[in-house]
């Protein structure tokens, strides 16, 4: 299943401005927040702090490229995009993507999509 996942390093090859913005968000340091509390390998925590846990990787030694909340956590999987972005575009990020992790069962923060989205929403792409 690893071949289905694109890491932020792949996206950064074309989407430099978006990657630079992402690096300044809490999503880019999501895994570190687990390390601080010693919870980085807790089964009920890790899936929301990495990309593809349980499919792209399971073993801790394979985690490095998937650490943190990355582009596909929000945008969804799209393995054909780098080779053919015109025919494999991403749609807008939907609230349901956020609610996978930002819900009453996973976090203590009262999540309001319209308020929180702007904190992590990457700059719009410049189209020709």
Protein language model regions, located:
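Short sequence/structural segments immediately N-terminal
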Residues: 1-128
